[in-house]
Amino acid sequence: MLKMNLANLQLFAHKKGGGSTSNGRDSESKRLGAKAADGQTVTGGSILYRQRGTHIYPGANVGRGGDDTLFAKVEGVVRFERKGRDKKQVSVYPIAK
């Protein structure tokens, strides 16, 4: 009688398993920066500049919100100006009628 040895058949992966990473995501952008240009006409309440902290300071007829957003208090023309040697400010000057 002929005895056959049955081979022990084992299957292995032909590609390595995909590892995990702690990267691969990013936060949504906050859309900060200028929302009105120098010389542009704006209405009262218009947002002029969105920022974190005070990169630009409020000037004439400009208010500062709780999140440091600068907004126009009156209708007029936007002007970005220097405030001293190293600071900047934005002002809104009413249009003469």
From Swiss-Prot:
Residue pairs linked by disulfide bridges in the UniProt entry: none
Keyword Ribonucleoprotein (UniProt): yes
GO biological process: translation
One function term, GO molecular function aspect: structural constituent of ribosome
Entries under InterPro entries matching the protein: Ribosomal_bL27, Ribosomal_bL27_CS
Similarity-based family: Belongs to the bacterial ribosomal protein bL27 family.
Protein name according to UniProt: Large ribosomal subunit protein bL27
Organism phylogeny: Bacteria, Bacillati, Bacillota, Bacilli, Lactobacillales
